[in-house]
């Protein structure tokens, strides 16, 4: 808080000179008590927000590093889909053979009914 003129303690300890037709000291003290409470609340809120900002910046840095590390590592996942594609191809071939076996025998039994498939 670089642009702050007073600390809560300075506001609390401020003494005003009394003049003949001056302000009521009790009124001034009461008002300053309220000002100090507000000021103190603003200082705490400002500190909380600064702490949260630092925490979030640190998290952004951490996530950025994780992304950079992930981008620089060889893609193990890129080889994995290839093996799953082979597996998928095997499954598709088996399914095709099974369909030919099941539906092929039906087609052989009734050649006029083949259009229903």
From Swiss-Prot:
Function: Divisome component that associates with the complex late in its assembly, after the Z-ring is formed, and is dependent on DivIC and PBP2B for its recruitment to the divisome. Together with EzrA, is a key component of the system that regulates PBP1 localization during cell cycle progression. Its main role could be the removal of PBP1 from the cell pole after pole maturation is completed. Also contributes to the recruitment of PBP1 to the division complex. Not essential for septum formation.
Coiled coil: 32-70
Keywords associated with the record: Cell cycle, Cell division, Cell shape, Coiled coil, Cytoplasm
GO biological process: cell division; regulation of cell shape
Record-level GO cellular component terms: cytoplasm
Record text on subunit structure and interactions: Forms polymers through the coiled coil domains. Interacts with PBP1, MreC and EzrA.
Domain of life: Bacteria
Cellular localization per UniProt: Cytoplasm
Family: Belongs to the GpsB family.
NCBIfam families found in the cross-reference section: DivI1A_domain (TIGR03544), PRK14127.1 (NF010725)
Name listed for the protein in its UniProt record: Cell cycle protein GpsB
């Amino acid at each position: 808080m670089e642009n702050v003129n007073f600390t809560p303690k300075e506001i609390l300890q401020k003494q005003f000179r009394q003049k003949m037709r001056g302000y009521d000291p009790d009124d001034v003290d009461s008002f300053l008590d309220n000002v100090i409470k507000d000021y103190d609340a603003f200082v705490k809120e400002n500190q909380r927000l600064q702490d949260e900002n630092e925490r979030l910046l640190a998290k952004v840095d951490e996530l950025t590093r994780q992304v950079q590390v992930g981008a620089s590592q060889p893609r193990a996942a890129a080889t994995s889909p290839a093996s799953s594609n082979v597996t998928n191809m095997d499954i598709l071939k088996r399914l095709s053979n099974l369909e030919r076996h099941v539906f092929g025998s039906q087609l052989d039994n009734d050649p006029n009914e083949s259009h229903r498939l």
